Amino acid sequence: MPRENHVAKQRRIGERLSRAMVKAHMDRRELAALTGYSEAQIALWEHGRAPLYPAELIKLCHTLDVLPEWLLCWERRLY
């Protein structure tokens, strides 16, 4: 299986962030208010145009009630 490039991975993370926001019934404004990040920064993450650092990841996951592994698109591989 070919490895996914960095840009494609960031886009997938952004898609999952958007899905988590919908599931939590939260828009960018609400997420920004709860996390302290700007709406513009959240939009960059959603569109895969900015990296998500560990502290940001943890805060977003806690706020949206999702696992970091899910948001990062990690897949468990069974051998």
Residue locations for each model-derived region?
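DNA-binding alpha-helical recognition surfaces that contact promoter or target DNA
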Residues: 15, 19, 33, 44, ...
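Short alpha-helical DNA-recognition segment
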Residues: 23-47
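DNA major-groove recognition helix of helix-turn-helix/homeodomain DNA-binding modules
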Residues: 55-70
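Short amphipathic recognition helices of helix-turn-helix/homeodomain-type DNA-binding modules
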Residues: 70-79
